[in-house]
Regions:
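C-terminal, well-folded lobe of enzymatic/effector domains
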Residues: 22-174
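An N-terminal structural lobe/cap that precedes and organizes the functional/catalytic core
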Residues: 1-28
Length: 174
């Protein structure tokens, strides 16, 4: 959840007290965020600029995350799949009738068959989907003609352990 301007975003805002994320809040977010470090980082860098306290910031993050239905192709794939960035947007629009393509930004690595890194959904302050700003321009975030969506689970049975699935890239409101 990143507060932002039309061009750019505020970050690491000064607060009366040093930003602290309680263990209970961190633990409560690990089902949708892949690590403790990321939970802490997101609040310190972006949450401090949101005007919300730590509980309010993560409550809103969860509310917006759960408001988005992740299309089946992006939930726990067991093999690498390839999509054009516009098809990623189409899938999210089809799964979420209130979304339009301009509300979604696809981010990927470099190269023609780059790996999907994030799917960003842009929201207004009141939680309504809005067109993403210039800092979410696709030519900056993902210029690949095709992107790879890798598997999120270990498929090697000989290990005897199945990896805990990571959530699909957080369609973090931006």
């Amino acid at each position: 959840l990143w507060p932002q301007y039309t061009k750019g975003w505020p970050q690491d805002c000064r607060t009366p007290r040093r930003p602290f994320v309680p263990d209970a809040v961190i633990s409560g977010m690990l089902d949708i965020m892949p690590s403790r470090g990321l939970v802490i980082h997101e609040y310190r860098k972006h949450g401090t600029c949101s005007g919300l306290d730590v509980q309010g910031y993560f409550q809103l993050s969860r509310q917006l995350f759960t408001s988005i239905r992740i299309p089946a192709d992006f939930v726990n794939p067991f093999e690498t799949q390839y999509f054009e960035p516009r098809d990623v947007k189409r899938a999210f629009v089809a799964a979420n009738p209130g979304l339009r393509p301009e509300h979604i930004a696809v981010a990927c690595g470099r190269g023609n068959r780059a790996r999907l890194s994030e799917i960003r959904i842009c929201f207004s302050k009141d939680g309504k989907p809005i067109a993403c700003g210039q800092n979410e321009a696709e030519r900056k975030l993902c210029s690949a003609s095709e992107i790879a969506v890798p598997p999120v689970r270990s498929t090697r049975r000989e290990e005897g352990v199945q990896a805990t699935p990571r959530p699909s890239p957080l369609p973090g409101p931006r």
